[in-house]
Amino acid sequence: MKVLEFAFSGPDNAYLPHQYQPRCVCYTGTHDNDTAAGWYAAAGEQERAFAERYLGTSGAENIRQALLRAGQGSVAELFVAQMQDYLGLGSESRINVPGVAEGNWRWRLLPGRTGPELAEEIRSLTSLYGRCPWRPEPVEGTEDGE
């Protein structure tokens, strides 16, 4: 089990995607971790700086996308991301805080929160990294791309 939110203490960290062995599962975070946006907001200066350097980007929205790409593109046999990470939601959407008895397991994906754009983002990433059947992206100016 490789949790990307645990990865950014330095280049030798076993949770960094370049350290993975194929027979593992990669997660952006688990039900016991903050969302990717919440993690980034709360990360210490050194951890955030290393994550930005490793992922080649900065800013919460860019980091969210980079974490999803890093996980999808890793050699992990499976990749799992919370819907909150695809939606870019912050700590208010965290599922569980270990050791806290109240207020956990309340987050719900409400109708209208997703749509064709999100479905296309997920399909595009999973297809690009070979995690679902590949189909070419339409090219503008061609028969399929109008």
Segments from the language model and where they lie:
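Catalytic cores of glycan-processing enzymes that make or break glycosidic bonds
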Residues: 1-138, 143-146
